[in-house]
């Protein structure tokens, strides 16, 4: 193993923010070796990226700059809705958006993404089959494997998958039993009114609400990840009514915010990232991660190249990194 590989692995192992994307002790990045796309003029380029604070980190950008030779790097932490607003408003401040897959249509349909050739990614050969082999349960376009490609020939990518995980429910075992917590409906249970939490991103919240509504007998949506317009309208009514009734202590959007709200006891049940639950437990506070009867919510995040960037090679190198 090379020194570069050791440094990369050490960086990921000890980065608390990046660990917010890991399952247990596994590394969240899909590639386990250090192979970076190099370009002769990379030193003349810069990388300006935007995304969640758990992927956009100075120590990661610093390491990328050192190993790639790119001239400059800068990162802006923002929620997905805020980042989308900036990019669709025509901002020229970014070369790359570390986007979550469900928001890909927003930049594809508005021509704000420039596809990345798969052949330019040395690490593509190591990608997990999660992103290359479709499941027979749904049509390919309803799965991540059918959404990341810009062409039917599968030669260019609208998003290069970098991290992925499955989210569940974080809860205080001193307040809820495992049986109570092991359903998405727990977040909306009046018993925990004023002490539950929900992610502020509507594309996340809606899917979780629909799973809860199915369990509560309020809907019968076959694929909560791809609801119809009518099903979305019903979920919106449900969420608005719950918010007006004071169900939620907070609509959280950041890792640190989530940890603080759970550790303080202000939120006793919420949708949560597993490492946030681990961070609460590390403080000596009671916190567990549920196994929802409806299943977990899967997601994938990765770099997308913003159309019109003059730093294309830097974005490709970062995606490969």
Indicate where each model-derived feature is located.
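Short beta-strand-to-loop elements that line the ligand-binding cleft
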Residues: 72-79, 98, 246-254, 290-291
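Extracytoplasmic/periplasmic substrate-recognition and gating elements
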Residues: 272, 276, 281-321
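Alpha-to-beta junction loops
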Residues: 90-98, 112-113, 192-194, 264-270
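Extracytoplasmic ligand-binding site segments that recognize negatively charged/polar headgroups
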Residues: 55-57, 108-257
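Hydrophobic residues within well-ordered alpha-helices
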Residues: 87, 261-263, 305
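N-terminal secretory signal peptides and thylakoid transit peptides that target proteins
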Residues: 2-23
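Early extracytoplasmic/lumenal segment of secretory-pathway proteins
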Residues: 38-110, 259
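Oxyanion-binding "anion nests"
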Residues: 254-275
